[in-house]
From Swiss-Prot:
Transmembrane segments: none annotated. InterPro entries: PduO/GlcC-like, PduO/GlcC-like_sf, YBR137W-like. Belongs to the UPF0303 family. It comes from the Bacteria. This is UPF0303 protein R02983.
Amino acid sequence: MNIDNDLRRIALQEQQLQFERFDLDTAWKLGATLRRMAGERKLGCVIDITLYSMQVFYAALDGATPDNPNWVRRKRNTVFRLFKSSYATGLSLLKQQTNLQAKLGLPDAEFAAHGGSFPIVVKGTGCIGAVTVSGLPQREDHNLVVEALAELLGADHDALKLES
């Protein structure tokens, strides 16, 4: 893994994986896509889609743990605060050899700079929410979200995915 390459690729993901419009039907389709992918692969995780103050999709799959919803909340809070993916935030902080508490005063109990939460962006509007997965290693959480977004938006996942 090369942090600079990953950060460039995540910036491209965040630029290209944006919606023309996003409503509750779109949230359901995105959540169902993630649920199908995770179920087919037998991934024990929690899936959450929240539009700021309203949770609009939630699923927990076999193998998820009681800690996963808290990880979802903390990663989602990071996206809501910084308007970029929690994985990009974590990699940026790793590169700077710091953390959210030291750099921004954000407590670990409320924020997590670990992969798995991705901003839901509507073109011309900005970040309106976050889609979050927790339960896998952080890079896999992030990759699953990106794959589902790419499928739903008709984007070329192979051109967007992080290198192995």
